[in-house]
Structure formats: C-alpha cells, structure tokens
C-alpha cells in the first residue's frame, strides 16, 4: 500500500505498477495480504508425465530435485513432522487427455522466492526427467483426410 485517501487507495503490485482502487471496491472485496503475519508461500509445481511413466519414480525424482533447491523451507507443523509427512508432498492431481499431472507443494520464505524457486524447478526437473527417461508428453493429433 502506497497511499490511502478518503476516495481511493494506491497499491504497488509485484511488477512495480501503481494501481488506484476506489475505496468502495475495497470495502466490498476480499483482500489477500501475502505479507501479513507469515510471509512463507507455497509454490505449486505441476508437471505432466506420460501414462507409461512409473509414477513412483517420477514422484521420487520431483521430490529429490525440490529438496536440493536452496530456497526450499520446511513448512511442516510439529504434528506433521511427528506423523512423518515429507517436507515435499507430491500427488497425482489429474488424469488428462495426454498426461498424468503431478503436483508438488514446495514452500519458500517469500512470494518472490517461491516464484524464483518454481521456475528453477521446472528447468531442473525437466533436465532430470530427460536423464531418467521420464517423458513429458504433449498432445498431438492424427489428421485423416477422406477421399470422396
């Protein structure tokens, strides 16, 4: 927040742009403050793998690559640690037309670090999948031309 007046509020977004919002909108809106209290942020790392993929292997590779990232933090509660919940949870979240989508929950200390970490992880996981021969599929179509 840069300035609050009787008629409007000016905020600066992550791209350093000034946004003028009428207070009537703010009064009736849900406000998300990412820096209030706990600034740690979860980055969802979603990657599609082929239906032929050994899912346990792909999950292990994703978890290992994320655990190596220097911006990763352990965001588990004491109860989660006691229960043996891993620092990085990876789950199947979708069975799509051309891929099985895996999602990893990776925590960083700030929203900026989470964004940087996420983009770094896309690269390192892709490179590791190449080494491990884990396919990231892409949709393709066969076109059939009928002679009439």
Language-model segment annotations:
Residues 33-34, 49, 53, 63, ...:
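Solvent-exposed, non-transmembrane regulatory segments of membrane-associated proteins
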Residues 1-82:
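Soluble accessory domains appended to multi-pass membrane transport proteins
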């Amino acid at each position: 927040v840069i300035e609050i007046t009787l008629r409007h509020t000016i905020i600066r977004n992550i791209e350093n742009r000034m946004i003028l919002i009428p207070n009537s909108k703010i009064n009736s809106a849900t406000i998300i403050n990412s820096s209030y209290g706990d600034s740690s942020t979860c980055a969802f790392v979603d990657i599609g793998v082929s239906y032929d993929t050994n899912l346990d292997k792909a999950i292990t590779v994703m978890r290992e690559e994320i655990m190596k990232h220097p911006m990763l933090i352990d965001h588990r509660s004491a109860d989660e640690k006691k229960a043996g919940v891993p620092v990085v949870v990876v789950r199947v979240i979708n069975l799509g037309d051309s891929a099985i989508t895996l999602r990893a929950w990776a925590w960083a200390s700030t929203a900026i670090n989470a964004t940087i970490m996420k983009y770094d992880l896309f690269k390192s996981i892709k490179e590791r999948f190449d080494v491990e021969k884990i396919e990231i599929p892409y949709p393709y179509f066969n076109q059939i031309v009928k002679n009439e």
